[in-house]
Amino acid sequence: MAKQILFDRDAREKLKKGVDALADAVKVTLGPKGRNVILDKKFGSPAITKDGVSVAKDIELKDAIENMGAQLVKEVASKTADQAGDGTTTATVLTQAIFNAGLKNVAAGANPMDLKRGIDKAVSAIIADLKVQSKKISNSNEIAQVATISANNDHEIGKMIAHAMDKVGKDGVITVEEAKGTETEVKTVEGMQFDRGYLSPYFVTNTDKMEVELDRPYILIYDKKVSSMKELLPILEQVVQSGRPLLIIAEDVDGEALATLVVNKIRGALKIAAVKAPGFGDRRKAMLEDIAILTGGTVISEESGYKLENATLEYLGTAEKINIDKDNTTVVNGSGLKDNIVARVNQIKSQMENTTSDYDREKLQERLAKLSGGVAIMYIGAATEVEMKEKKDRVDDALHATRAAVEEGIVPGGGVALIRAGAALDNVAFHNEDEKTGIQIIRTAIESPLRAIVYNAGLEGSVIVQKVKEGTGDYGYNAREDRYEAMIAAGIIDPTKVTRLALENAASVASLLLTTECVVADEPEEKSAMPPMGGGGMGGMM
């Protein structure tokens, strides 16, 4: 395949077109007056979303080099979403602002590497200032405010997330599911989550979410590795006859055993999934015992005199539902006896009192939360499927933002925190004029989120940015109410982690784009013309 190779300004200008195409599509969603984007789907009805990363993921450009620029900005949005769960649109807007300002300076003769050093120094200074501005979340009301902002100013969702966190604690497990009707509600169920995902993606039952969902499954808990199908076959046959799904939790499942399970799952002969046991060493044994007590099963362990080939259905635990993604397994409503669970909880509490190690105490606390905390399920109701998907996206965003806020605290929202942090750039040392220019690029770029919020509200950005810069503390512009006020008192707050990661990831990719001197991509294939059709009729006929 022939390649096209572009250098210097030509390469960067092409990349810029891709960056602008994606960023312009994403930034229409920013702020309280941001608009929706409709995404065409190959199958089913179009999706309507105000979630920046959903828009970014859907964009592919025809030109290969422009598409490279778009894909790199998509990486910023995806990474920010993965790490913080929100802030994807802010990250995209910042990337575009840093890259475009940098591009003008490179075209004017600035050294890209010195610009990058200046940008990196400035970003470090801004992040240090954000940490100083940050304020710990202290009550349920502030949790509701963070969730409300992330859910596009939906107060109902904000209150529900705060309510769910009250029920299961800040470290508890909250899952989002579709409701049968139009009502949205929160329910708490006894449940447990551990940090092990499925052993093979072929076990996935819900391909949209890439999750395994098992209803009323049997749960086989084994403390050794399963490699041979021979030892697993007797219990598998019993499960197949019962017609129920099976989850295998073992030290590992590999080789012939894993291959056979995958083949049976693909053929539809058996609804099955396998995950590795959580923890290591003695903690693994203790956690397997916790799972067994929660689900009413028995840990099949040769130390206790049990062999896998002799196992029957009586040894298996059961639960109402199990959800497994690539990282976590959640067991909902295990069938274990209440008395046994209470006894186990009390045993862990006494171990916590007797231990002298902070590490052990922390791990025991984790086990205690898993056994007694439960899982909160948010059932999202909507009138149509399209509305349901859009609402679920917003709830997911809000949940992630709230967790981020609990983790690292909050800063004033509406783009104010970044503008206030700009003062820290006055003290950043630089070695040459190009580094100074890099610092100046960040000074200008940190205004871009507020400019985009104001633009989406139908107003002129420069005037409002200047007025906000003249203020102090959390004084900013409330685009929803069209007035200037104290952001935190008005409930306009952002998680510190979201703002920090948006800037870090944006600066990282924008700097790489600026220091690009050459781009190599496939030449577009020319479609060959259709061959001429043969003449109709038969030769030689009179």
From Swiss-Prot:
Domain of life: Bacteria
Annotated catalysed reactions: ATP + H2O + a folded polypeptide = ADP + phosphate + an unfolded polypeptide
UniProt xrefs under PROSITE patterns: CHAPERONINS_CPN60
EC identifiers of the protein: 5.6.1.7
Class of the enzyme per the UniProt entry, highest EC level: isomerase
Pfam family, one: Cpn60_TCP1
Example GO molecular function: isomerase activity
GO biological process per UniProt: protein refolding
Broad class of where this protein is predominantly found: cytoplasm
Residues binding ATP, per UniProt: T29, L30, G31, P32, K50, D86, G87, T88, T89, T90, G414, D494
UniProt KW Chaperone keyword: yes
Keyword Isomerase: yes
Function: Together with its co-chaperonin GroES, plays an essential role in assisting protein folding. The GroEL-GroES system forms a nano-cage that allows encapsulation of the non-native substrate proteins and provides a physical environment optimized to promote and accelerate protein folding.
Entry's family note: Belongs to the chaperonin (HSP60) family.
Name recorded for this polypeptide: Chaperonin GroEL
Organism per entry: Cytophaga hutchinsonii (strain ATCC 33406 / DSM 1761 / CIP 103989 / NBRC 15051 / NCIMB 9469 / D465)
Phylogenetic placement of the source organism: Bacteria, Pseudomonadati, Bacteroidota, Cytophagia, Cytophagales
Gene: groEL
